[in-house]
Design a protein with these regions (language model features):
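ABC-type ATPase nucleotide-binding domains, specifically the catalytic core motifs of the NBD
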Residues: 1-12, 22-25, 117
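Hydrophobic anchor residue at the start of the ABC signature
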Residues: 45
């Protein structure tokens, strides 16, 4: 059974979220729809982290995002992974981003696993060619 954790209305926003994504502190009183695509993605990740999950699922976090924000998101993912208190499942088509962050990888095609291994093996196993369009 999977559910979504919630925080009571009016709860304090964890300070750590602003440390992870400083731009959100500047945008605190703006509506989410008024934020850029990259800021919205950072907000979505921060909201997912607010409840202190044991598993963080990130589905294409780099989709349509400018390079500087991709670097920020990568920095946050590395920091969170380094803490070791949550598992992170990254679904990503941007090969370089995935290769840089992966401890382990799995490549699927039409619902079937066609390759898997350690992140450090991605290059030697020719994974870039498997995910090229």
């Amino acid at each position: 059974r999977m559910g979504l954790a919630t925080r009571p209305a009016g709860s304090e926003i964890p300070v750590e979220l602003f440390e992870l994504f400083p731009v959100l502190k500047q945008m605190l009183y703006r509506r989410g729809g008024d934020l850029s695509g990259g800021q919205q993605q950072q907000l979505a990740i921060a909201r997912a982290l607010a409840s202190g999950p044991q598993l963080l699922v990130l589905d294409e976090p780099t989709e349509g995002i400018q390079p500087s924000i991709i670097k920020d998101i990568g920095r946050v993912i590395r920091m969170l992974a380094g803490r070791g208190d949550m598992a992170i499942l990254l679904c990503e088509q941007y090969y370089d981003f995935a290769e840089e962050l992966a401890d382990d990888f799995l490549v699927m095609e039409r619902g079937e696993v066609i390759a898997s291994g350690l992140g450090s093996e991605m290059q030697s196993k020719g994974i870039r060619q498997l995910v090229s369009i």
